[in-house]
């Protein structure tokens, strides 16, 4: 989140404010979905919409929130059928990189 603040605050302070106050300090803290589930939904939405630039950050957060490598791999397989094979293959190098850089 600090990287987002540093890179965007001068360009669009409003987006930083809404991201911090509404997205992270409200939506992500609502009690009806666990952080792992919210992370899984977020990664799936990014994957399905082809927004691969954000996958690394959010997949790391999902794994911080207890998503395993095996589960992440299964999510990609499942989403390939619903969101398209090109999206799956676009995301695979990023997912592989996340897996390799995380402690085992």
Annotate each PLM feature.
Residues 77-80, 96:
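Short amphipathic alpha-helical surface patches that mediate protein-protein
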Residues 37-46, 75-76:
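Short, structured motif recognition centered on aromatic/hydrophobic residues
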Residues 49-57, 87-89:
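Short helix-capping/linker segments at secondary-structure and domain boundaries
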Residues 46-49, 64:
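Short, solvent-exposed interaction modules
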Residues 1-36, 60, 64, 88-104:
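Acidic, glycine/proline-rich low-complexity segments that act as flexible tails and inter-domain linkers
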């Amino acid at each position: 989140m600090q990287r987002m603040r540093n890179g965007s605050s001068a360009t669009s302070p409003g987006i930083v404010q809404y991201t911090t106050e509404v997205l992270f300090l409200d939506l992500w803290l609502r009690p009806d979905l666990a952080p792992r589930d919210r992370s899984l939904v977020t990664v799936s939405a990014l994957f399905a919409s082809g927004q691969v630039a954000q996958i690394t950050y959010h997949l790391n957060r999902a794994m911080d929130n207890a998503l395993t490598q095996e589960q992440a791999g299964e999510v990609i397989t499942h989403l390939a059928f619903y969101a398209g094979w090109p999206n799956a293959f676009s995301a695979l190098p990023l997912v592989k990189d996340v897996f390799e850089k995380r402690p085992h």
